[in-house]
Structure formats: C-alpha cells, structure tokens
C-alpha cells in the first residue's frame, strides 16, 4: 500500500505518519488535490451550491432576476 505525504494543519510540517504530527501533535491532512474525472458526477450540485453561495454573498448575478 503506497504511503501518502501528509501535512500538519497546525505547524505546516510534512510527514508520512498517519495519525498525529511528530513535531507538534496536531491533526494531519492530505495536501493533494482530489482526482479529476471528465464525467464529474457531482458537478451539477457543486455549481448549484456555488451559485447559491454567490447570490447570498453578493446578490444575484447581473442579468438574472431583473
């Protein structure tokens, strides 16, 4: 099983350990991006969520709702 490099959320150090940072004891995260899929089965939902968040933060986009 290949090991993945992990980064500490607290101090930013990189490690191969899986549970806690050996330097500060903080939580670890995988710093790699998610895999890309051309089919993108959840793209429709992600775009809908982005549109709703944008509308709540800045109002509806120009040209919509007029």
UniProtKB/Swiss-Prot annotation:
Q: Which Pfam families match?
A: Nop10p
Nucleotide-binding is among the record's keywords: no
CC terms in the record's Gene Ontology section: ribonucleoprotein complex
Residues crossing the lipid bilayer are: none
GO biological process terms held by the UniProt record: pseudouridine synthesis; rRNA processing
Q: Which InterPro entries match?
A: H/ACA_rnp_Nop10, H/ACA_rnp_Nop10_sf, Nop10_arc-typ
Q: Name one GO molecular function term.
A: snoRNA binding
The highest taxon in the source lineage is Archaea
Q: Which UniProt keywords apply?
A: Ribonucleoprotein, Ribosome biogenesis, rRNA processing
Keyword rRNA processing in annotation: yes
Q: Which SUPFAM superfamilies match?
A: Nop10-like SnoRNP
Family stated for the protein in its record: Belongs to the NOP10 family.
The function of this protein is: Involved in ribosome biogenesis; more specifically in 18S rRNA pseudouridylation and in cleavage of pre-rRNA.
Query: What protein is this chain from?
Result: Ribosome biogenesis protein Nop10
């Amino acid at each position: 099983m290949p090991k993945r490099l992990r980064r500490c959320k607290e101090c930013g150090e990189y490690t191969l350990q899986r549970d806690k940072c050996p330097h500060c004891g903080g939580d670890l995260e995988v710093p790699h991006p998610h895999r890309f899929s051309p089919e993108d089965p959840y793209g429709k939902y992600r775009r809908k969520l982005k549109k709703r968040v944008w509308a709540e933060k800045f109002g509806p986009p120009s040209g919509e709702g007029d």
